[in-house]
From Swiss-Prot:
Keywords: Ribonucleoprotein, Ribosomal protein, RNA-binding, rRNA-binding. PANTHER family: 50S RIBOSOMAL PROTEIN L15, LARGE RIBOSOMAL SUBUNIT PROTEIN UL15M. InterPro entries: Ribosomal_uL15, Ribosomal_uL15/eL18, Ribosomal_uL15/eL18_sf, Ribosomal_uL15_bac-type, Ribosomal_uL15_CS. GO terms for biological process: translation. GO terms for cellular component: cytosolic large ribosomal subunit. The keyword Repeat does not apply. Residues 28-42 have a biased composition (Polar residues). Belongs to the universal ribosomal protein uL15 family. Pfam families: Ribosomal_L27A (PF00828). This is Large ribosomal subunit protein uL15. GO terms for molecular function: rRNA binding; structural constituent of ribosome. Signal peptide: none annotated.
Length: 152
């Protein structure tokens, strides 16, 4: 078998449907779009998925609920197992060092969670700690220090 002898399997390909090329083709005149109406017009495929033919859409019929709290604090989360892997004994962990090591993106508001084991004594400075994380840091002789977020 050579490269020029390759061809697709039987039934794997379809012939292109040539529409609007006369009644003898079987796909002339209305080009398989039926008679009148919105779906027979050009641009029919550009309608958004939520469009319901002009009736009030479902999304507008259901009541609004809740709100977005503008003062919600969004924490970047780091687990203890990540600190165990990336930091050495007696090193200081703060949002800046976490950002440098690629554990957080912004480092504006960091919360330390207690997933994993910590065997190294670390000084951890973060905006928030889970109870289990704080306990595990202190159990190995480390320091868990809460810092305040810098407001800009």
């Amino acid at each position: 078998m050579r490269l020029h002898e390759l061809k697709p399997n039987e039934g794997a390909t379809h012939k292109k449907k040539r529409v609007g090329r006369g009644i003898g083709s079987g796909h002339g005149k209305t080009s398989t779009k039926g008679q009148k109406g919105q779906t027979s017009r050009s641009g029919d495929s550009k309608l958004p998925a939520r469009f319901e033919g002009g009736q009030t859409p479902f999304i507008m019929r259901i009541p609004k609920r809740g709100f977005k709290n503008p003062s919600k604090i969004e924490y970047e989360i780091v687990n203890l197992k990540a600190l165990e892997n990336k930091f050495n004994e007696n090193e200081e962990v703060n949002p800046q060092t976490l950002k440098e090591k690629g554990l957080v993106k912004k480092g504006e508001c960091v919360k330390i969670l207690g997933d994993g084991q910590l065997t190294k004594k670390l000084t951890v400075k973060a905006h928030a700690f889970s109870a289990s994380a704080e306990e595990k840091i202190k159990s190995v002789g480390g320091i868990a220090e809460k810092i305040t977020a810098e407001t800009t």
